[in-house]
Amino acid sequence: MADTSDFRNGMTFIWKDDLWEIVDFLHVKPGKGGAFVRTTLKNVKDGHEVEETFRAGAKVDEVRVERREHQYLYEDDYGLHFMDQESYEQFSMPPEQVEGREFLKEGGDVDIVFRADTEEPLRTEVPQKVDLEVTETTPGVKGDTAQGGDKPATLESGATIDVPLFINEGDVVRLNTETEEYETRVSAASTV
């Protein structure tokens, strides 16, 4: 059992028969009345966030979670399949538990968060920066870059992002998965 004085960002606990992670919290001690803690909680299973207030000293059941690196294998009707990098065990997760799946490519690394006591996979965490090949975009025309600007591009994972006009099909680009924005061109397509 933990109480509100133990709250910290990333802490996971059981509340209202569900698993929640603390995204943000603030201890408040008003001049009149009892102290309380304002929190932003994220549901571990489906990802939706709620704001909740706890009285100071309220007790919650803390749950220990572990992050382990896995390799993304493929997606089919049963879900997304992953392999543990150390034991080579494979398992699948439903798509709604896989955050950032539009940036996963087969063979790519991803961290999976497990509930330590039951070994149940809870969610995935994709790397903050990933390199993906541009599979479809309009060709850049000489002189287009004078004014700057962006154009849509489809990546090998199926995601669509805005890229600068000089990016062509076959280029490998680095993007930030948190902001879902282009960062830089890693390599240009070969024109052989």
From Swiss-Prot:
PROSITE patterns: EFP
Chief location: cytoplasm
GO cellular component, one term: cytoplasm
Keyword Cytoplasm: yes
Location of the protein in the cell: Cytoplasm
GO molecular function terms attached to this record: translation elongation factor activity
UniProt keyword Metal-binding present: no
Keywords: Cytoplasm, Elongation factor, Protein biosynthesis
Tree of life domain: Bacteria
InterPro entries xref list: Elong-fact-P_C, NA-bd_OB-fold, Rib_uL2_dom2, Transl_elong_fac_P/YeiP, Transl_elong_KOW-like, Transl_elong_P/YeiP_cen, Transl_elong_P/YeiP_CS, Transl_elongation_fac_P
Residues forming coiled coils: none
An example Gene Ontology biological process: peptide biosynthetic process
Pathway: Protein biosynthesis; polypeptide chain elongation
Record SUPFAM superfamilies: Nucleic acid-binding proteins, Translation proteins SH3-like domain
Residue numbers spanned by region Disordered: 133-157
Reported function: Involved in peptide bond synthesis. Stimulates efficient translation and peptide-bond synthesis on native or reconstituted 70S ribosomes in vitro. Probably functions indirectly by altering the affinity of the ribosome for aminoacyl-tRNA, thus increasing their reactivity as acceptors for peptidyl transferase.
Protein family (similarity comment): Belongs to the elongation factor P family.
Official protein name in the record: Elongation factor P
Gene: efp
